[in-house]
């Protein structure tokens, strides 16, 4: 298990936006950014990007890199948190930092980044509710769950402004769970333990996707902002 490194992986400045699940629909993301005429800056995808995900023999990896290159020419830099529908090995093998324009920055699990002088803890992954109908090694991975080491909580408690992850506190409203997967509920309980562990860091803000629903709730004095599919949230505090 990767040990926690308190040194920020990246230091971002300028306009920054968080986005919910993309699911490989990169053309729709690019079109939306263009139509809405957002000021180019940092685009942080909160998992389920489709990187390394192969469904019906279609691998979205090449398309993702082309998408990042295209946005790079427009002044955007893409950062990505790992989702449960992203191949974990892509993040493990990625360089710790990237300076090439138009090349995606994969935010590794259990790291931090600075956004306009605000410190964020980053961790990816999650449990796939639909894994019973997925193909191991292609569209589902045993090492997909999120894990938060206790030493990270001890080191960062009260020191982080926010958390960036794929899963988070359950949005309001019931989320259906498959009954055809005997071990699913047990794995989801392990995931809830990780969520509670993250709340002990006492972040002010927590941004995440996964649940395909826009939702805002206050949990243990933390503003928990869940972003739906391709929902965009501008982080406006960039010194203006």
Task: Go through each PLM region and give its residues.
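Structural motif
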Residues: 15-16, 42, 118-120, 161-162, ...
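Binuclear metal-dependent phosphoesterase catalytic core
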Residues: 113-116, 196-201, 211-240
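Active-site-proximal loop/helix segment associated with metal-binding centers of metalloenzymes
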Residues: 3-5, 118-189
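Zn-dependent metallo-beta-lactamase
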Residues: 1-18, 24
């Amino acid at each position: 298990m990767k040990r926690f490194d308190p040194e920020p992986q990246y230091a971002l400045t300028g306009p920054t936006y968080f986005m919910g699940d993309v699911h490989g629909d990169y053309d729709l993301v690019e079109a939306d950014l263009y139509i809405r005429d957002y000021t180019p800056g940092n685009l942080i995808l909160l998992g389920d990007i489709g990187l390394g995900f192969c469904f019906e023999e279609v691998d979205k990896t090449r398309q993702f890199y082309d998408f990042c290159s295209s946005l790079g020419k427009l002044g955007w830099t893409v950062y990505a948190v790992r989702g449960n529908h992203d191949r974990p090995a892509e993040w493990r093998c990625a360089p710790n930092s990237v300076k090439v324009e138009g090349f995606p920055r994969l935010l590794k699990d259990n790291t931090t980044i600075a956004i306009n002088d605000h410190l964020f803890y980053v961790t990816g992954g999650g449990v796939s509710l639909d894994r019973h109908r997925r193909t191991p090694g292609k569209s589902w991975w045993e090492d997909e769950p999120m894990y938060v080491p206790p030493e990270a909580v001890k080191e960062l408690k009260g020191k982080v402004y926010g958390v960036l992850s794929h899963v988070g506190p359950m949005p309001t409203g019931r989320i259906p769970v498959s009954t055809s997967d005997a071990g699913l509920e047990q794995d989801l309980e392990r995931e809830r333990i990780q969520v509670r562990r993250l709340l002990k860091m006492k972040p002010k803000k927590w941004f995440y996707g996964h649940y395909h629903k826009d939702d805002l709730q206050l949990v243990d004095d933390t503003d928990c902002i869940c972003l739906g599919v391709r929902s965009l949230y501008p982080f406006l505090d960039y010194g203006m």
